[in-house]
């Protein structure tokens, strides 16, 4: 986890943010949207969301990821996109989307969503809040 380029992720802090996890997520993935609603229920957590478009499945996901990254408020733009499916207006800026794709491939992430704990544990799929809480406890042992 310490080797993740956290500057290439969208950072969201809830509560004190003492628990840390990374999420690889595709903006057009229905399971990612389901996970996002579960992550919204977590407290005392810092989330690093790496936009990870799976272009073979979702051909518009890359452009949406870039639009979110280039938005004035990335966290708000991501939340809006995941809740409503509405992407922000397209803009151009330097973005990490290609690096995120390469990073995910290097880490062996084959599907979205995928969670990574600060201790290197992986939880694939759209788990409910209770499962994520349990996983965070186990990951810290």
Q: What is each stretch, according to the model?
A:
Residues 113:
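Long C-terminal interaction/binding lobes of large macromolecular proteins
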Residues 4, 90-103:
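Active-site nucleophile elbow and catalytic-triad environment of alpha/beta-hydrolase enzymes
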Residues 1-20, 41:
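A short beta-strand-turn-helix
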Residues 19-20, 25-93, 105-110:
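Structural alpha/beta surface segment adjacent to cysteine/selenocysteine redox centers
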């Amino acid at each position: 986890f310490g080797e993740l380029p956290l500057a290439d992720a969208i950072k969201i802090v809830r509560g004190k943010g003492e628990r840390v996890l990374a999420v690889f997520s595709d903006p057009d993935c229905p399971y990612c949207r389901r996970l996002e609603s579960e992550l919204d229920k977590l407290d005392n957590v810092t989330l690093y969301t790496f936009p990870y478009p799976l272009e073979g499945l979702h051909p518009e996901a890359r452009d949406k990821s870039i639009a979110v990254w280039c938005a004035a408020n990335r966290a708000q733009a991501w939340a809006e996109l995941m809740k409503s499916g509405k992407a922000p207006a397209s803009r151009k800026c330097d973005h990490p989307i290609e690096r995120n794709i390469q990073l995910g491939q290097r880490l062996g992430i084959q599907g979205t969503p995928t969670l990574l704990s600060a201790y290197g544990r992986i939880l694939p799929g759209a788990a409910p809040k209770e499962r994520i809480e349990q996983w965070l406890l186990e990951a810290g042992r």
